[in-house]
Regions:
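Non-catalytic interaction-recognition regions
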Residues: 1-249
Length: 249
């Protein structure tokens, strides 16, 4: 109660309490006391349980996993995945991939649903995972490393008329709305769904629309500008979600 009152006195735009679903009665009691003392009732987000594929963690049964051990295991598994793909170990990059994978796996699930954490799925480079998003980001950087010297004041956007390009442009336009929805509803999964959709659309664009070998230089420049915009929005989404960027995958 004292902590909640202290938060009320900080003049923040929002006062939010994050609790497990099993703490709903506790919050009602705290909120009632705070209101009775003359303070504004804080908002609350009730999260469901996080469980491993092996089952629910339980202190009584001795199946609780400490966060420190959990994250250490995540790094080990991420580095193993990197070695399998590249034949070389990279612990620093493994940390970024692992931490991002754990965060994303939990953020992509709506708060009222239990999170079933699966190592194999979380660290997969395909599907709705952080490694897949990071791989898409790295692919964009690879293209830009080969051609980034365009005159952005002389771009013919009318050349971006391929159906996939139009879908990407519309999706980029929707990003602020996705952020606003996530903010108002306290729902980070709105951003994860958006980021995954953007990565999928970019992958389709990558295979359907040549960038460096387009029909002419004007179309190449327009497509370079488009993927620059995709990169910026991806970085913004990753920043909101707390995902760590990597230079290569």
């Amino acid at each position: 109660i004292a902590y909640t009152i202290w938060k009320c006195k900080q003049n923040a735009d929002k006062n939010v309490i994050i609790l497990g679903q099993d703490q709903q009665l506790y919050f009602k009691q705290v909120a009632a006391i705070v209101e009775e003392l003359g303070y504004e009732r804080p908002d609350v987000v009730h999260y469901a349980f996080v469980m491993l594929v092996e089952g629910k963690m339980s202190t009584r049964q001795g199946t609780v996993v400490l966060l420190e051990d959990f994250m250490r295991e995540a790094v080990t598994k991420a580095d193993k995945a990197i070695v399998e793909r590249e034949k070389v170990s990279d612990i620093e990059r493994a940390k970024k991939v692992a931490y991002s994978a754990v965060k994303y796996s939990m953020e992509k699930i709506s708060t009222e649903r239990n999170v079933i954490f699966d190592w194999e799925q979380a660290l997969n480079f395909e599907g709705d995972t952080a490694p897949y998003l990071l791989y898409s980001y790295v692919r964009i950087n690879s293209i830009l490393s080969k051609r980034d010297d365009i005159n952005e004041l002389d771009i013919n956007y009318g050349l971006l008329n391929h159906p996939t390009e139009i879908e990407l442009i519309n999706l980029l336009y929707d990003f602020p709305k996705a952020v606003q929805k996530a903010k108002l509803e306290y729902s980070p999964h709105v951003i994860t769904h958006y980021a995954f959709d953007l990565a999928k659309k970019f992958s389709l664009f990558y295979h359907e629309c040549s960038v460096l070998n387009a029909e002419d230089i004007l179309l190449t420049n327009a497509r370079i500008k488009l993927i620059k915009c995709i990169k910026q929005v991806m970085e913004n989404a990753f920043d909101i979600l707390g995902l760590q960027l990597v230079e290569h995958m």
